[in-house]
């Protein structure tokens, strides 16, 4: 390794100018080589990339976003108006998302909002400020305003959950309706006949699916539904415990 390269590596950040000086090329040539422009020969592109790796060059995210129009960041806006609603799954969920994003050299931009109006305003702000190229939408609603907004702005998104009409949507979900049906049948197999059902908020699509599964399980077991044992609105463990009592 030459002296100039070692000196640069001792600095906090390697720049395009440092690379250009080390390679004896212009900054424009180095920049175009790093971005894969075809007017730069394959051998030069490879040479520049190898030197960038050796010197530890990393492009500034903000400058890269301005140049390419992409931030290489996913957006996630969490609701804070229901205390504790995210708690049962949030840590594992964030760990999975950030790990997958990092493997593709992407980052995760996380924001919070209280209520639908603030949620939509936050999504628009992250888009306008180029802080996210697309969004993950957890806890899908039966009539999800986030989807309508992002579709109108032609911004991609992935649903964590389902909607009534999933055509054209990328989504992933657990089969909550099947899990609920199996839960009912498991209780029946242990001799239980008076089975209660504590559901989440009915504004969320998963709650409707879970109720479908519960009703199907009761029907499969030949049991009648008891309206006084079917309650909804529990979005936290504490709320569920209170309704159970």
PLM features per residue range, with description:
Residues 115-117, 138-143:
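Short beta->alpha connector loops
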Residues 26, 72, 133, 193-194:
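Short acidic/polar active-site loop segments enriched in Thr and Asp
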Residues 1-9, 22, 54, 96-105, ...:
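Bacterial carbohydrate/catabolite-sensing allosteric modules
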Residues 57-122, 219:
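Amphipathic helical "hinge" segments at domain boundaries
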Residues 132-138, 196-198:
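Periplasmic-binding protein-like
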Residues 119-131, 240-245:
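Short, well-structured alpha-helical segments in soluble
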